Amino acid sequence: MSDINATRLPVWIGYSPCVGDDAVALLNRGEG
């Protein structure tokens, strides 16, 4: 799962920085 999220994260940031920030928060919560 982590690898998939890591691959999609840069794409989200590229399309929308705001969405990228949310994605980072979700990843942090998932890993935490």
Swiss-Prot record:
InterPro entries: Amanitin/phalloidin. Processed by the macrocyclase-peptidase enzyme POPB to yield a toxic cyclic heptapeptide. POPB first removes 10 residues from the N-terminus. Conformational trapping of the remaining peptide forces the enzyme to release this intermediate rather than proceed to macrocyclization. The enzyme rebinds the remaining peptide in a different conformation and catalyzes macrocyclization of the N-terminal 7 residues. Probable toxin that belongs to the MSDIN-like toxin family responsible for a large number of food poisoning cases and deaths. Keywords: Toxin. This is MSDIN-like toxin proprotein 3. There is a cross-link at residues 11-17 (Cyclopeptide (Val-Pro)). Belongs to the MSDIN fungal toxin family. The keyword S-adenosyl-L-methionine does not apply. One of its GO terms (molecular function) is toxin activity. The keyword Cytoplasm does not apply. Residues 1-10, 18-32 form a propeptide.
